[in-house]
Amino acid sequence: MTAPQVPIAAIATAPGRGGIGVVRVSGPDVGPVMRSVCGQALKPRHATYLPFLDGHGKVIDHGLALYFPAPNSYTGEEVLELQGHGGPVVMQMLLTRCLQAGDGIGLRLAEPGEFTRRAFLNDKLDLAQAEAVADLIEASTEAAARSAARSMEGEFSNAIRQLVDKVIHLRMLVEATLDFPEEEIDFLEQSDARGQLATIRTELSGVLAQARQGALLREGLSVVLAGQPNVGKSSLLNALAGAELAIVTPIAGTTRDRVRETIQIDGIPLHIIDTAGLREHAADEVERIGIERTWDAIRRADIVLHLVDATDYLRHGLSETDDAIDDQLSGQLPPGSPIVRIVNKIDKAPAVGDVVFGGNRPHVVAANGPNPTEIWISARTGAGIELLRRELLRLVGWQSGNEGNFLARERHLTALRNAQSHLDIAAEQAEHQAQALDLFAEELRLAQDCLNSITGEFTSDDLLGTIFTRFCIGK
């Protein structure tokens, strides 16, 4: 693949005021811009302090200029970077000046992500690494940033390439058997093809597990707090966030609209959504709209916490309204979606400690008990909150302390799952070698295509456009 030959320019730093701002120019020949704006040719890969000049030789700003000859640059093309004072007016003046100076060579404003796209097209990085650049910029936690850096350094790509190499080797053995059926030597039997396939499937499962963990770091979890009015949803939001974010009063229906806050638990972003209380008849039109938005949030949630009042629960069991909410939750969410009943306000109920329910009968377990599906808490005192935090992570399969995660995207997970599916089918075909060897080879090819799509070895132009247009301009 070859990048376009038209030179591009953009402000590479974020909008707003700052101590330093950067204008980046990339293309097959940035010499005219360099000589016109900097007044001289620059020594490659050295920072030179000088004035940046307008078209009349007047000073726009003073700063550092750096020139990177091709192919030893970020994009693989010639790159000029001008580092000046980071005011928006100064940066815009400098960018405009570069575009004027480069008019004769067709210099134009870069599109979002175009510098990184050129780096990909010039084989400076693969597609997974290119995506990791954007993920590192957008990382919302330290753990996410570290995982993105590992992917940017090529750890994810290397794991994929190792799998691809093993699939290719196995395909060669299969193709040899198909091409020379008259040979008495059974290539598959001699090379233990089934054993090789089993190894590939095991390693792919490991990469998929790491990618799932990385996807959690990147996307986080959407956790909706649902329940009747005045059961302590806003208090629980405040308890999880460790700050008074939502208004808490004894008046039912205080929360009329969704309140969203992002917190971190073990490096995972949790998007906690406090919602309007659910009840059959809204008090007014505003509350009715709030309840509709609650159900909209529930349908989009990864986990739903259904809060009930501990005192009422102990005295009368689950109310008809809460029972109806349970039924509605089950109907609105995809099968298998986690719904955890949170019994709140245990500080106002008889001393129950850390209690969870099993079946229809309550029983007491330790705070680190096995897989609770109902948790008793006090959002006011904090009792049970740590247990709830651990349960949220357990429900999504988070493995604490895993330093080898890749910051994966949904398309990576889809490609890995599809590759896994093709290898599973190949394993079934391998059991009927004589009758289905050609099908076995085809499933291996399809699995290889899925894996190659992650690094961009086999990728459509439409997908590339979708990925790179989500970058910021200047990157």
From Swiss-Prot:
EC numbers, comma separated: 3.6.-.-
Binding residue positions for GTP: 230-235, 249-255, 274-277, 378-380
InterPro entries: G_TrmE, GTP-bd, GTP-bd_TrmE_N, GTPase_MnmE, MnmE_dom2, MnmE_helical, P-loop_NTPase, Small_GTP-bd
Cofactor: K(+)
Single Gene Ontology MF annotation: metal ion binding
Transmembrane segments: none
Compartment(s) of residence: Cytoplasm
EC class: hydrolase
CDD domains named among the record's database cross-references: trmE, TrmE_N
SUPFAM superfamilies: P-loop containing nucleoside triphosphate hydrolases, TrmE connector domain
Keywords (A to Z) from UniProt: Cytoplasm, GTP-binding, Hydrolase, Magnesium, Metal-binding, Nucleotide-binding, Potassium, tRNA processing
Cofactor note: Binds 1 potassium ion per subunit.
GO biological process assignments: tRNA methylation; tRNA wobble uridine modification
Cross-referenced Pfam families: MMR_HSR1, MnmE_helical, TrmE_N
The keyword Methyltransferase is assigned to this record: no
Coiled-coil ranges from the UniProt annotation: none
Stretch forming the signal peptide: none
Gene Ontology CC annotation, any one: cytosol
Keyword Cytoplasm carried by entry: yes
Amino acids binding K(+): 230, 249, 251, 254
HAMAP family for this protein: GTPase_MnmE
Family: Belongs to the TRAFAC class TrmE-Era-EngA-EngB-Septin-like GTPase superfamily. TrmE GTPase family.
Self-association and partners: Homodimer. Heterotetramer of two MnmE and two MnmG subunits.
Function: Exhibits a very high intrinsic GTPase hydrolysis rate. Involved in the addition of a carboxymethylaminomethyl (cmnm) group at the wobble position (U34) of certain tRNAs, forming tRNA-cmnm(5)s(2)U34.
Full protein name: tRNA modification GTPase MnmE
Species in which this protein is naturally found: Cupriavidus necator (strain ATCC 17699 / DSM 428 / KCTC 22496 / NCIMB 10442 / H16 / Stanier 337) (Ralstonia eutropha)
Upper classification of the organism: Bacteria, Pseudomonadati, Pseudomonadota, Betaproteobacteria, Burkholderiales
Chain's gene name: mnmE
